Amino acid sequence: MSKMRVYEYAKKHNVSSKDVIHKLKEMNIDVSNHMTMIEADVVEQLDRSFSKEQKQELKKEEKKAPVKTPVLEQFEEDEDEVIQTKVPIKKAVVKNREGKKHDLQIQQKEKKIFNNKKNKKQKPQQAPQQEVQKKKEKELPKKITFEGSLTVAELAKKLGKEPSEIIKKLFMLGIIATINKDLDKDAIELICSDYGVEVEEKVTIDETEFETIEIVDNPEDLVERPPVVTIMGHVDHGKTTLLDSIRQTKVTEQEAGGITQHIGAYQVVVNGKKITFLDTPGHEAFTTMRARGAQVTDIVILVVAADDGVMPQTVEAINHAKAAKVPIIVAVNKIDKPTANPDRVMQELMEYELVPEEWGGDTIYCKLSALTGEGIDNLLEMILLVSEMEELKANPNRRATGTVIEAKLDKGRGPVATLLVQSGTLRVGDPIVVGYTYGRVRAMTNDLGRRVKEAGPSTPVEITGLNEVPQAGDRFMVFEDEKKARQIGEARAQKQIVQQRSVKARVSLDDLFEKIKQGEMKELNIIVKADVQGSVEALVAALQKIEVEGVRVKIIHSGVGAVTEYDIMLASASNAIVIGFNVRPDANAKRVAEAEKVDIRLHRIIYKVIEEIEAAMKGMLDPEYEEKVIGQAEVRQTFKVSKVGTIAGCYVTDGKITRDSSVRLIRQGIVVYEGQIDTLKRYKDDVKEVAQGYECGITIKNFNDIKEGDVIEAYVMQEVARK
């Protein structure tokens, strides 16, 4: 018998990898994970061990089988004996005519004895039932429940006592009460404790905030569910091609000549088990949904091109997956190319703690070609293996809850939403609340374009019947009736749930010390962006050394270049602070940061960053001047004039540029110079300010290296007191 891996043995003998690992550990054989290679002699030991267990189980079943039969046989034997005793008596009567009367008397006596025995058996059965009924009437309840308060009459009714008796007890406790007096929780508990009855107060749950309601299922009701997979990676590394290849090989082979319908997600069947793929490649959608509190992904496939290696977006994708605490499977794509070097990719990814199993790590690497289809079956098997180890389960036997994947307004069908059912079962006709809209599920379509009547956990379906279009990432919940769904949907709309999300409390340096004191924070998440890689490394190293009150700094992402919208979304999802060193946020990043209430700190000196973070963590931040950007202008043309210098012909794109404001020159997201405006002109006239949509000429004091395409940002310093 040859060597094999743990998961191969499990697959061959139709047992789970966890059972095999557990058995090996019982045999004192060191096993790290499901990819560990086991020797031939160990395989034989396993075979013997599993065969013994099977034999023991069979013996147990044989012993358990004949439990009730002896009682029945004994009962039948007793009946036979009774019949046999009667038969000879009848025969004796027939043979002996003279003693006929005597025999009849004997027979009647025997009947009476037999009937008496029957009555004796029946009477003890009836008597206890009557006694139990009497006892039940007198017995006090073990527990009573109430909501808010109870009157004396209501409490007496719950306890099965007279109100006068309760009033007497209250009087003995120093409480003068009438039959209609409302009793508080303490009084109810005192009376009930006197009777030895347990009290439970019902807490009213606000179902309008159903995202915060956590329903704990009975472990017996949980069943295995398909994993939900998201594909991430750098641009042009083959994410979309891989999705298309999986769909063509697995979905279209089920559909003979059928056209699949794009609903934002689809399912494939591998070895009789389903896998759900979110058809939204890239980490942007992933992070946007996570920022809204929707954690839908179970496994992330990180696609890296074998001929290109690790790129900036690859690193971003790794950081996003780690921040969400989702297992990563690395798909090394384009191995069919002559320049492919998978080993180089593995080596580069080791820097980001993605160590291959072949090299002693715990990250699964799959070499494949999305174009030719090579290695795709192996990738799908690995997804099922990781899913098995993660023990993904859900309860299908309750009202459905889940998340919106996509939503749109269709001309013919009205609002259409793609929902991913995460728990329970969604059925046609269910009253549903989605985000801040509501409706009844009118029709359901699966990813193959077929009408379905119900959808279980991890199943994506497209539904119609909502009154408005929800947002991607919104949570949904099914309610018992349409009236309640309408009430909750309208209440949520009135609370303007969308605006409340944007006002979500974020961590900032201003309130950092308070959160540390209250024990709310154990780690301070930070995103670092700088102008050059050397600055990034120096800043990260310096920040990681900071530790105050047991709170450590955790760098969740770092990179070179301007602060982007995606950095802000990651900070929003991870409750992080963004630090920009010698770089500026672009216009979109500023807008998103303001909406998501993300704290951005911009610096040009490293020790100032360290000082500010340490001071914030110690609660020693002084009042400071806050920078307020008042406008931006784009340099369209430059003019060199002797004795004046370089004049920048600008177009004001945002806000306004004022004569007395400070300015900074930004080139490709990097700050080149900071200073003051020397002259500000419109045509030939000096002006105090130029508003958005107008052209102007600007010169900067002591600086002439202005180029076309540069951005001039105007700002003023305002003094603000810290709270």
Swiss-Prot record:
Residues 333-336 are annotated as: G4. Residues 258-262 are annotated as: G2. Pfam families: EF-G_D2, GTP_EFTU, IF-2, IF2_N. The keyword Kinase does not apply. GO terms for cellular component: cytosol. Keywords: Cytoplasm, GTP-binding, Initiation factor, Nucleotide-binding, Protein biosynthesis. Residues 369-371 are annotated as: G5. GO terms for molecular function: GTP binding; GTPase activity; translation initiation factor activity. Residues 112-138 are annotated as: Disordered. The keyword Kinase does not apply. GTP binds at residues 233-240, 279-283, 333-336. It is found in: Cytoplasm. Residues 279-282 are annotated as: G3. InterPro entries: EF-G-like_DII, IF2_II, IF2_N, P-loop_NTPase, Small_GTP-bd, T_Tr_GTP-bd_dom, TF_IF2_bacterial-like, TIF_IF2. CDD domains: IF2_eIF5B (cd01887), IF2_mtIF2_II (cd03702), mtIF2_IVc (cd03692). Its main location: cytoplasm. Residues 233-240 are annotated as: G1. Residues 224-393 form the tr-type G domain. Residues 114-123 have a biased composition (Basic residues). HAMAP family: IF_2_B. Belongs to the TRAFAC class translation factor GTPase superfamily. Classic translation factor GTPase family. IF-2 subfamily. One of the essential components for the initiation of protein synthesis. Protects formylmethionyl-tRNA from spontaneous hydrolysis and promotes its binding to the 30S ribosomal subunits. Also involved in the hydrolysis of GTP during the formation of the 70S ribosomal complex. This is Translation initiation factor IF-2.
